[in-house]
């Protein structure tokens, strides 16, 4: 097969992969334009545009001069095309990009210790886990504000442990932020779309808690925040 023939074959493989994964494109949009609009493929915008232009030139023009191909497609572009095909066929998953080295707390952890960890790590939300590594709730600065609002400043002591805040840890009860579970095998682009939305109460999604199947009763494997996936 000629060089241009190999290139066209790869283009068709990519187009088939896009159709298989996404069910095709809308409004007759080319696979290359379609992919360039997706966050996952933003780093490949230049390559996708070039591939599209070269493909159209070869497909719709006579590229032979005196019976020989007048266009040479370099392996650099071929390799980029193969890489994009690989990403479409084997998409990056939540498990690939989530943070697994977590800063966590247990019910017996002193609050002062947790706050020091938050300052040192710049994490604003700390997962509180039980002895099996399952999520009990999320501790944040708003957890403290909520307790003060409910119980008064006199309720706070230097000896406080996370258990003293147990009534305010439930992920459903945070006022400003929401939290969801997600399976580690879910495509990362779905996580991106989730972070762009607000829930029915207008709360932003602050964290995705990653488990094997997205089940709250499973061990926490990692977390994902908007800063991990959004530019």
Where in the sequence are the language-model features?
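A structure-centric signal for secondary-structure junctions around beta-strands
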Residues: 45, 176, 204-205
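The conserved cystathionine-beta-synthase
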Residues: 104-122, 129-130, 148, 180-213, ...
């Amino acid at each position: 097969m000629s060089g241009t023939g190999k290139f066209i074959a790869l283009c068709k493989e990519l187009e088939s992969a896009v159709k298989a994964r996404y069910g095709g494109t809308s409004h007759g949009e080319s696979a290359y334009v379609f992919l360039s609009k997706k966050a996952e493929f933003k780093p490949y915008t230049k390559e996708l545009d070039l591939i599209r232009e070269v493909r159209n030139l070869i497909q719709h023009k006579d590229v032979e001069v005196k019976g020989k191909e007048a266009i040479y497609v370099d392996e650099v572009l071929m390799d980029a095309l193969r890489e994009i095909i690989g990403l479409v066929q084997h998409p990056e998953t939540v498990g690939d990009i989530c943070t697994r080295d977590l800063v966590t707390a247990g019910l017996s952890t002193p609050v002062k210790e947790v706050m020091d960890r938050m300052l040192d790590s710049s994490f604003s939300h700390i997962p509180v886990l039980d002895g099996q590594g399952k999520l009990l709730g999320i501790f944040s600065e708003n957890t403290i504000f909520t307790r003060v609002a409910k119980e008064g400043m006199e309720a706070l002591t230097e000896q406080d442990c996370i258990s003293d805040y147990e009534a305010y840890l439930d992920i459903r009860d945070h006022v400003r932020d929401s939290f969801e579970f997600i399976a580690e095998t879910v495509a990362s682009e779905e996580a991106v779309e989730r972070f762009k939305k607000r829930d029915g109460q207008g709360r932003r999604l602050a964290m995705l808690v990653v488990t094997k199947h997205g089940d709250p009763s499973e061990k926490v494997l990692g977390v994902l925040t908007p800063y991990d996936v959004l530019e």
